[in-house]
């Protein structure tokens, strides 16, 4: 009896087939992720004359973020829990983890030391495995909450702050 219960409800008592349709917050986040990807792409294109001066760490950081930003709307707006969602989730998680890991080696401000933004990198390095574990355990409430937190904090807010204050993307975009 217990195994049939766990097969249907999972270890945490949440139904696998519970509604996971996107809500308003997720639609807005998907829209903003697309917008941020477009603006970042425009900035990178406008910065072409300076491409030769950019380190491989920055390029890897930008590439993995572009993948995450491109996948985010798909993950937020389509059906969840199927094999495609899981595959895209793994790609999204690996790219976000790589982005955070590489950012620890990017210390061009603050006299080569760590800055406030590096706290977000450490939180991401800890949080991505927790996000994966919550999905594997079918703790869908925690998984969805953490995914939203990453989209809002690690992508949208951090992405917004990559443009002002004489940051590279901002200087390219507004040049």
Task: Name the predicted role of every residue range.
Residues 2-175:
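Alpha-helical membrane insertion/targeting regions
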């Amino acid at each position: 009896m217990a195994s049939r219960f766990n097969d249907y409800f999972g270890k945490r008592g949440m139904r696998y087939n519970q509604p996971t349709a996107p809500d308003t917050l997720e639609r807005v986040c998907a829209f903003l992720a697309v917008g941020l990807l477009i603006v970042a792409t425009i900035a990178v294109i406008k910065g072409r004359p300076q491409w030769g001066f950019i380190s491989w760490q920055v390029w890897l950081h930008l590439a993995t973020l572009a993948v995450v930003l491109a996948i985010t709307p798909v993950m937020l707006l389509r059906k969840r829990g199927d094999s495609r969602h899981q595959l895209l989730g793994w790609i999204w998680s690996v790219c976000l983890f790589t982005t955070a890991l590489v950012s620890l080696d990017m210390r061009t401000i603050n006299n080569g030391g760590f800055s406030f933004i590096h706290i977000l990198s450490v939180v991401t390095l800890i949080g991505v495995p927790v996000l994966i574990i919550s999905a594997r355990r079918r703790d869908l409430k925690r998984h969805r909450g953490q995914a939203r937190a990453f989209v809002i904090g690690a992508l949208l807010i951090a992405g917004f702050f990559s443009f002002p204050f004489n940051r590279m993307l901002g200087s390219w975009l507004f040049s």
